[in-house]
Amino acid sequence: MKIDGYTRMAAVIAKPIRHSISPFIHNQAYQLTATNVVYLAWEVEEEQVEQSLQQLRVLDMLGANISMPYKKKVLPFLDQVDGSAQLIGSVNTIVQKDGRLTGYNTDGLGFLKSLPKTFSIMNKKLVLLGAGGAATAIVVEAIRQGVGEIHLFVRPESLDKYQAIFAPLSETLDVSIVLHDLSSRDQLNTTIEGTDLLINATGLGMDGSSLPIPKDFIFPKGCLVADLAYFPAKTPFLQLAEEQGAKTLNGLGMLFHQAAVAFELMTDKTFPEEEVWQALKLEYPDYVLEK
């Protein structure tokens, strides 16, 4: 990668963030598309977020990606927020142009793009275990793509909190979003029947041992099973699903595709998907579910 007096910057902003693989993805894409930009990881404190965003303008940066815990905190400091990001209530991509900062959320589209090309969410039944993090973004994008039915399972103590989030969303988008108690086995067994896409968005399993469901849980036949985690590459949730013959995917594809959408928003160039994906698999083999 050539760096000279004309090189611009982009960054991912969060804390912690030095472990991120986003710099690898974006810098590979810049190199393959002859884009004179370097992408860095900025680990900043909460009280430095506004100042960091101001640097996007001052340094005429291409933009930035925002990771947890700052996806909501950046909203007041933006000049404009894309409609989908407004519905989701968080931003993971900021484009800087002529001193103006525009916020987007590419998480939901990134996840849907990571699904097998033979799978369409149109008129399908979607069930999510957990409603935090990227779950709202996935729900909004699934609705945009014509999902038929949405169910979310959350901890009983969080039901009221998420009801307050998803009820207005359901009304605005005119789609039924039903919340359930994750601790109720009867609700889970009844609701899971006929599910086309089941997503673990709880974070349980990143320790390599915990499960968001009972060990004797029976996955619906023909159901595509996803986990938003990508380390370990195969969580206990995905392992259990595979043992029952289900098709599975982890969260690496979502991370990759949300980065691809962000790259295109920032550069107005086509993301070199196949080349970067192959490079990513070689650089981070431990994150890849299918070798």
Please annotate each region the language model reported.
Residues 2-119:
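Phosphate/diphosphate ligand-binding glycine-rich loop within oxidoreductases
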Residues 3-4, 121-122, 144-146, 214-223:
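Short, conserved loop/helix-junction motifs that constitute active-site signature segments
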Residues 9, 125, 148-151:
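Residues at the starts of beta-strands that form the adenosine-phosphate
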Residues 14, 103-105, 115, 119, ...:
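Glycine-rich adenosine-cofactor-binding loop
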Residues 144-149, 244-247:
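Conserved S-adenosyl-L-methionine
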Residues 147-173:
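NAD(P)-binding Rossmann-fold cofactor-contacting core
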Residues 176-248:
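Rossmann-like adenosine-cofactor binding region
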Residues 224, 228-291:
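Adenosine-phosphate binding glycine-rich loop
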